[in-house]
Amino acid sequence: MSLAPGTETDLQNRFRSHFCGRLNTEYENKQVRLAGWIHRKRDHGGLIFIDLRDHTGIAQLIIQPEKQELFQKVERLHVESVIAVQGTVVKRSEETLNSRIPSGAIEVLVDDVQVESHAVALPFPVADELQTSEELRLTYRFLDLRREKIHQNIVFRSQLISKVRRYLEDHGFMEIQTPILTASSPEGARDFLVPSRLHPGKFYALPQAPQQFKQLLMVSGFPRYFQIAPCFRDEDARADRSPGEFYQVDMEMAFIEQDDLFEILEGMLRYLTETMSTKRITQFPFPRLSYRDVMNRFGSDKPDLRVPLEMQDVTELFVGSSFKVFASNTKEGSCIKAMVLKGRGTESRQFYDKAEKRARELGAPGLAYVQYREEGPKGPIVKFLSEAELSALQERLAIETGDVVFFGAGKWEKTCKIMGGIREYFSDLFELDRDELSFCWIVDFPLYEFDEKESRIDFSHNPFSMPQGEMDALDTMNPLDILAYQYDIVCNGIELSSGAIRNHRPDIMYRAFEIAGYSKEEVDKRFGHMIEAFKMGAPPHGGIAPGLDRLVMILRDEHNIREVIAFPMNQQAQDLMMSAPSDVSRLQLRELHLKLDLPVETAEQEPG
């Protein structure tokens, strides 16, 4: 396990003089006091061997048969009982050396044992990391956290937070705490609401992010802010998203431009990677790719750049084609995308059927493909394509014999996303380097999008981002062509964070909202406190907030976010260990002036 904080001297007391994992041959013949949990216990012909575990690792103890009182005391103990011992460090014999643990060259001959806590039979073993159901692990999380792998994850997380603080403080940032009880916002995800006892009928909300507070700190004259910020969103769980709450490294800076922020965050991520991981960053500074570019090439705004697959636009090759499916998608707003899979042109029919099934799940009517075989092009659509079109495709896409090319056709955005999903589906065919961190910035997001359902223009992402070109762009450009100073940081297909250079000018803000159909009065009603603050002198500012949990996941090579959180909820947003959420009494509800209006199937569970 990872080393405990502090030194031996710092933590000496009646329980311990040393840590288990730090003992070595330098301590030979020295008296030591150790304390911890019984990891394993073995009786070998009258000798009892105990692997004693503390936060730093394991030390082997020996209870000799002549110590009858100690022998009987220890013999009755279950694993995971807590003991404090005193004894003498001795070298192990050559045949008993254990190179798998740092203390494997020594053992401790025990003179005294104090039993601090008796452990009952356990619901699952700690010493052997056997497959255990997640439900059981989360119910007994305090036990699960003793297991080496997850214990190290939490230690790593603590050390990473410490390094983040050090880096940001060295770069002029101040750590400032923002409120946990705040106002509900109609934007974004669903809020967690907290009823007010003192103000009947009114509610606080737990913050989805400290967004407005950190911007107001810039208005208050603090140049650089950060916080290891808890955020609360009532949303469903995913492998890389914890339901309910998560933590982010929340940052904001005044008097900066986009490049300044990129330099700070890239430096921090490189520092963390180099000091805490054996992984390597593929390219530094991180490449910057426009939203339009990544959608055209990868079909996703969070691409895994390790996957050696790219889409290419072949729309112009099929203008006037006799294949109507392609010809009808050569007009403005539509496209034909092609993606070559090298060396897969001779796969079985099942291979292509599975790929087509995935395409249908993504919303496509099917998945067209052409196999370039020794005997010539094959596949379901070959009969509809001319020899000239097949040759032009082969030349444009550098197709070789044995390759297969897949196609998507339709409206640009939908087609890109479907083909991006197919790219992700095929990524399992490649042996990706798990030690490679392929960071990139996604920039130049559109400020607006056209809402097909509402038949109107609306903001595509963050309405408070500064438009590129500022007021001039809003007054002179087609709204759908206006780009925002908004950016995402992505690593290996995982979005770590979104950020933006903020719109700090009320006149530009009113105009931006006007284009999206919001009146000045409506903007004032929704965001009046922010507008008022900006009217009193707001500096140019911007920020970002990388997800702490996701960052630890990436650096620790974990695929499940619950493996890097000490006490996570399950996928149904339940804390199985604390039995939350739980019923509350009628008295508690009455104090908050609340009555329950439960769905029929749960009404019988109303608290009595």
From Swiss-Prot:
It comes from Prosthecochloris aestuarii (strain DSM 271 / SK 413). It comes from the Bacteria. The gene is aspS. Its EC number is 6.1.1.23. It is found in: Cytoplasm. This is Aspartate--tRNA(Asp/Asn) ligase. Pfam families: GAD, tRNA-synt_2, tRNA_anti-codon. L-aspartate binds at E187, R233, H461, R502. ATP binds at R233, D234, E235, E495, G547, L548, D549, R550. Homodimer.
